[in-house]
Amino acid sequence: MMRKTKRNWTAAVCVLTAALSTTPVFAAKEKEGSTSKANTESISTDASAKDNGERTIIDHAGNEVTLPEEINRIVVTDTLPLPSVLSLYLDSAEKLVGISPVSMSAAKAGLLGELYPEILDADTSFFENSELNIESLLALEPDLVFYNAQNTELGESLTSAGLTAVAVSVTKWDYNAADTFDAWMDLLADIFPEEEEKAEAAKEYCEKVEDQIEEKTKDLTDDEKKNVFFLFNYSDTALVTSGKNFWGQYWCDAINAVNVGEEIEAERSNASVNMEQVYSWDPDIIFISNFTKAMPEDLYNNTIGDNDWSSVSAVKEEQVYKMPLGAYRSFTPGADTPMTLMWLAKTVYPDLFEDVDMTDEVQNYYDEVYGIELTDEQVAQMYTPSTDAANGYGISK
């Protein structure tokens, strides 16, 4: 693997629930927001400079945040994919001194820890039993702390402790992964303008992939559209899919497939279902997220709980797939969002995308946007993730 030369880059105790096992990156939806790309660009405004070198930005919660002149120590709390996006944006993880244990498990199991081994040295101990300890976070002496915009209580506690805190939204764009990724890149461009060209390149590449998929799938009839079931979490006691208010809906809409769980109104990871519903939907294809240890073989062999998958079309035709794990778990928005889109489209409609070589696509994307040359083996690793990717997150097998 080759990549561009990297740039070298205390208070009262307050324990807050971060709810890592259920909702840190999928917290309650904000009232404002739109799915339009115009709005993703308007949310993040140009930073205004002050005479003393400080700059102000508007974060995703609408807060005016004054940034320090130098940002050398960063903590990312409960926006789980952000450490990977930030590392690739900066082409370094050296500034990251603290991240969530759930972000760390993905870094260890996926590609991020290999590309930026320094991220494996980031502290995770400021989370104790899925709760965030402000005193432990303060001990890391961060110049900047990112937090989930929906966790307003945490944001208030961070600022009250004298920390510079920036809110990052995961729901403002109605679970549109591409728009959310674009907005994250816009925000990073405001904070770190020296890399703003990378933000534009990522957004343009994502739009290009969306356009390619639309062109190839636009003539599909309703009968030709595949029925897709997302298995977000699966264990002896849980069977959770993506309803209409979660990332699975966007992935299906973007590739002109049908999310069989669209009828479920529950938001985030709360769309629990039973096997009778799965039988009635009879999906053509099943995608298993990396937020669960379940693998395709578990459905083929009925090795989890008492459920029998043998009559489900996707299982009978061996059309069950584990989602990729590149820089982060690909079910959510992240640095790999354009490649997740292309992989989903090619997997669901192989005949329409027979000219697409995913190894070439991923290598070109990483090189063009991030300046990183991936080997064939590294790309293959992304598409054969282990069960370790789910470590630390919620209920697992």
Predicted feature residues:
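Proline-aspartate-enriched helix->loop->beta-strand connector
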Residues: 124-129, 133-150, 274-291
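Extracytoplasmic substrate-binding proteins
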Residues: 54, 154-237, 262, 315-316, ...
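Structural recognition of the beta-strand scaffold that forms the well-ordered cores
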Residues: 73-77, 97-100, 144-148, 165-169, ...
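A contiguous binding-surface segment within folded domains or other stable secondary-structure elements
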Residues: 270-325
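A short, structured surface patch at a secondary-structure boundary
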Residues: 77-136, 144, 257-260
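Short, low-complexity disordered leader/linker segments with a strong preference
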Residues: 1-70
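Alpha-helical, coiled-coil/dimerization segments enriched in small aliphatic residues
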Residues: 242-268
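Short, solvent-exposed loop/turn elements at domain surfaces
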Residues: 65-67, 82-87, 105-109, 236-241, ...
